[in-house]
Amino acid sequence: MLHKINRLQFIFFAFFSALSANSLAQAIVNIEDLRREGEVGFFTNISASLDAARGNRDRDYYSLQIRFDNNSENAESFLILQQSERKSNNKTMDESTFMHGRYILLGEEGIHWEIFTQYSENPFRNYQKRSVFGAGARYELTNTMRLGAGFLGEDETDLSGKSKTTDRFGFYLHNDFEIAENISFNPTFYFQPSIDDFENDYKASMILAIDFKVNENFKICLL
């Protein structure tokens, strides 16, 4: 019976993995994997990575992340700052800047309220810069499933330098499926349609992740 259940879960994962190629056309940062939900205390984390290679082609890459979390029984909050850059023969090939701050007021009966702000720069990919400010409600549908609904204001500058301000609805659905012992499948779906042009102006993303939990302090995540 257990083998049959695991097989069905694998088929479910493979099916949605096949769909994800088209769904990631407008990538949205997955905040669900960044939460410390239910962990009480103050946490600080600083991580850095540096990679350099010399030869026919010189390659350099660095990334830096600073994170602060402050969680209590009544509220949770976190701030994340990220910066990365990749160069080849002293020419910048990719760079990104990301900042996200969020405050969650924990309510009763599985209904919580949150407010957030986000800023990102990604001039070599989808846009030059994007800033977002929003608020909404977060619902605990089950022990593992979360549903979010709210509003956000978006100010985005595309690769051509054209700026646009848009008010959007924001929806997301997240769940955790246990595939096997210490292995979980974590799909997250985002949908952000324009309030003024619901049918033609929207951003959607389906982010699929598999977590391999090695121990209480270390896990590997595959996207």
Task: Cite the ranges covered by each PLM segment.
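Cleavable N-terminal export/targeting peptides
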Residues: 1-40
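Short glycine/proline- and aromatic-enriched beta-strand/turn motifs that initiate or cap beta-hairpins
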Residues: 26-72, 76
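Residues that define the transmembrane beta-barrel architecture of outer-membrane proteins
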Residues: 40-42, 58-62, 93-97, 129-133, ...
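Repeated loop/turn-to-beta-strand initiation elements of outer-membrane beta-barrel proteins
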Residues: 42, 74-79, 109-113, 144-147, ...
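Residues on the lipid-exposed face of transmembrane beta-strands in outer-membrane beta-barrel proteins
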Residues: 46-50, 64-70, 101-105, 135-139, ...
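Transmembrane beta-barrel strands of outer-membrane/channel proteins
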Residues: 48-50, 79-83, 99, 115-119, ...
